[in-house]
Amino acid sequence: MSIQNEMPGYNEMNQYLNQQGTGLTPAEMHGLISGMICGGNDDSSWLPLLHDLTNEGMAFGHELAQALRKMHSATSDALQDDGFLFQLYLPDGDDVSVFDRADALAGWVNHFLLGLGVTQPKLDKVTGETGEAIDDLRNIAQLGYDEDEDQEELEMSLEEIIEYVRVAALLCHDTFTHPQPTAPEVQKPTLH
């Protein structure tokens, strides 16, 4: 399966979010949408829920709504792809500092947990690998750094954390969208 839908550009999405006055960064919005999808909400109710969570229940303007639909479709496609094409939507480029990326990652994770929690209200009851991953995400959401730290070392650590978060999101998606039966399924004999 290939990704048919493309994500809007990060700066373009930032402009739409600022024009709408949502108070969210593109990374936070993507985290929220990703959390909702990973929690099992992949039907048409995602947009009104997003309005409730980010815009006091009011619909977004046309440009932002279109960009968010693209983001949702591309994210959903990437999460369902066997090639694991899902990536965190973080600022990138030469003009983006490692500190900006760390802040964006913390915002992404916080909003991912919000989206996941809205669709899976019993997150604290989740056990096993997924439960551990959710606990780790809660810790990552508190991510801090010292601006005196070696930026190269911080960049390497950040890349490892980003990859861990990506895999944790995929694990959540697999857990909540493909639930495992709690007891062995017993097939009843077919009467002819």
Curated annotation (Swiss-Prot):
Annotated InterPro entries: YgfB-like, YgfB-like_sf
Source superkingdom: Bacteria
Disulfide bonds: none
Pfam family, one: UPF0149
Recorded GO CC terms: cytosol
PANTHER family given in the database record: UPF0149 PROTEIN YGFB
Cross-referenced HAMAP family: UPF0149 (MF_00346)
Family: Belongs to the UPF0149 family.
NCBIfam families xref list: PRK01736.1, ygfB_yecA
UniProt protein name: UPF0149 protein YgfB
Native source species: Escherichia coli O139:H28 (strain E24377A / ETEC)
